[in-house]
């Protein structure tokens, strides 16, 4: 069975029936509410799979719609009537994420792409890391247990180089920089500034949580191929954009870092979008 068929049916990637829920360990029985933010533009064909893999104990799903014309919003509401839809007013993934973060009410926020490349059932691992003491749970395709079906040799090399630069410049220990499947405590929204509207916002977050002295834990994650549609990623162009973000950030020496009470993400003034 091909991925196209899998994307259209409520079944797993290998053809097996997905469980009605993902068992949670006993220490997660009192997990705080979890919000999942999904930026989407013309992802109607992929949403059935994305929504189906989300654990049933998720408190809230926030779909940030980038003016889709293929019925993305209608599909989302049909699949999950309680979905919170935010109409993105600006452009870019960073703008979409900032709009989504502002609309979240959960104590934990998870970032998930709408193309079906991320397995929603991995969210339990992210939440477990946060409940166990991490401030920021960073997905990694190259940590032990992770993997990817969607990375060319040039992208892999570029990611490795950019990751090495960030680790050297900011004292991080990342194994995967350019991967946006992350989760964090909502109180983090009070402490760092996100002033990037493009996809580079993910790199900016990765750098600034380290600069702030937050506890970061990598989570092994498997990236799958996009189910439907074509990715607009361009290895060289996008790599240069990420490099610019890295170079403009000022590193803070380890000796002067202190662990803050919280991490702030200051949302720019003015309306980010309309929730419905």
Residue ranges: model-predicted function:
Residues 88-103, 121-199, 226-243:
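Acceptor/aglycone-binding surface of glycosyltransferases and processive sugar-polymer synthases
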Residues 2-3, 12-31, 169-171, 194-276:
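Hydrophobic helical membrane-anchoring modules
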Residues 38, 51, 59-68, 86:
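Short beta-strand/loop segment that forms part of the nucleotide-sugar
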Residues 20-25, 41-56:
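Short, well-formed alpha-helical segments that are part of the catalytic scaffolds
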Residues 109:
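Short aromatic/hydrophobic "clamp" motif used to bind/position activated sugar donors
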Residues 59-62, 73-103:
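Conserved donor nucleotide-binding strand/loop of the catalytic core
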Residues 33-35, 60, 204:
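Cell-envelope/extracellular polymer assembly enzymes that use nucleotide-activated donors
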Residues 65-73, 116:
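A conserved acidic beta->alpha catalytic loop
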């Amino acid at each position: 069975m091909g991925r196209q068929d899998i994307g259209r049916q409520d079944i797993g990637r290998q053809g097996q029936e997905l469980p009605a829920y993902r068992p949670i360990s006993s220490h997660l029985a009192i997990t705080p509410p979890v919000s999942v933010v999904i930026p989407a533009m013309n992802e109607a064909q992929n949403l059935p799979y994305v929504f189906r893999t989300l654990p049933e104990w998720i408190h809230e799903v926030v779909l940030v719609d980038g003016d889709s014309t293929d019925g993305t919003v209608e599909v989302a509401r049909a699949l999950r009537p309680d979905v919170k839809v935010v109409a993105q007013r600006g452009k870019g993934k960073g703008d979409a994420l900032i709009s989504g973060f502002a609309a979240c009410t959960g104590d934990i926020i998870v970032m998930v792409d709408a193309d079906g490349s991320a397995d929603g059932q991995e969210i339990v691992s992210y939440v477990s890391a946060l409940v166990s003491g991490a401030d920021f749970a960073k997905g990694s395709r190259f940590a032990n247990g992770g993997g990817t079906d969607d990375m060319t040799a040039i992208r892999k090399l570029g990611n490795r180089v950019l990751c090495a630069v960030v680790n050297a410049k900011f004292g991080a220990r990342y194994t995967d920089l350019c991967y946006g499947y992350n989760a964090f405590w909502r109180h983090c929204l009070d402490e760092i500034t996100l002033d990037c509207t493009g996809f580079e916002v993910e790199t900016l977050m990765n750098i600034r949580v380290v600069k702030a002295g937050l506890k970061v834990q990598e989570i092994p994650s498997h990236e799958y191929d996009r189910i439907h549609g074509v990715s607009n990623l361009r290895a060289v162009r996008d790599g240069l954009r990420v490099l610019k973000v890295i170079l403009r950030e000022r590193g803070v020496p380890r000796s002067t870092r202190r662990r803050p009470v919280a991490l702030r993400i200051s949302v720019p003034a003015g309306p980010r979008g309309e929730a419905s």
